[in-house]
Amino acid sequence: MADDNNTNGAASPTLSILAQYTKDLSFENPGAPRSLQARDKAPTININVNVNANPLSDTDFDVVLSLNAEAKDGDKTVFHTELAYGGVFRVAGFPQEHMLPVLFIECPRMLFPFARQIIADVTRNGGFPPLMIDPIDFTQMFAQRVAEEQARAKVEAVPN
């Protein structure tokens, strides 16, 4: 007996990238040229990550991965960079309960290597060593987002 993964003639799920683009890119080096001089210790780097998804049609979605990195030496900003990197994805054939994980885990996972390279290039071009952002656990980020939304819904559901 052969395995049949195509139940009831339904199309198998597909996820494809139709386009990728830089939506917004900013790099600030407010202390240049002093910030480029050798320093005793490496600056502290804080990185914030966000993912947004918006429908364009029944099957096409715009997913934007936002990376914000700031390097500080004490209270002085050494550099600050922001990137909004987007992709237009065609998502078809997935059960409804899998749509949010696909949009908020798989799509940003596909965008991340390109966004990481842009951040590395812009920091290098700004006169610093390239900032190589560690891989991001989008599954954990999505789980945290869902937990926060559920907690917020509970608080809003409690009568005053």
From Swiss-Prot:
Subcellular location: Cytoplasm
Keyword Protein transport: yes
GO molecular function: unfolded protein binding
UniProt main location, coarse: cytoplasm
Gene Ontology BP, a term: protein folding
Transmembrane portions of the chain: none
InterPro entries membership: SecB, SecB-like_sf
GO CC terms: cytoplasm
UniProt KW Chaperone keyword: yes
Coiled coil: none
Annotated keywords: Chaperone, Cytoplasm, Protein transport, Translocation, Transport
Disulfide bonds: none
Pfam families registered for this protein in UniProt: SecB
Family: Belongs to the SecB family.
UniProt function note: One of the proteins required for the normal export of preproteins out of the cell cytoplasm. It is a molecular chaperone that binds to a subset of precursor proteins, maintaining them in a translocation-competent state. It also specifically binds to its receptor SecA.
Subunit structure: Homotetramer, a dimer of dimers. One homotetramer interacts with 1 SecA dimer.
Record-linked HAMAP family: SecB
Name of the molecule in the record: Protein-export protein SecB
Organism: Rhizobium leguminosarum bv. trifolii (strain WSM2304)
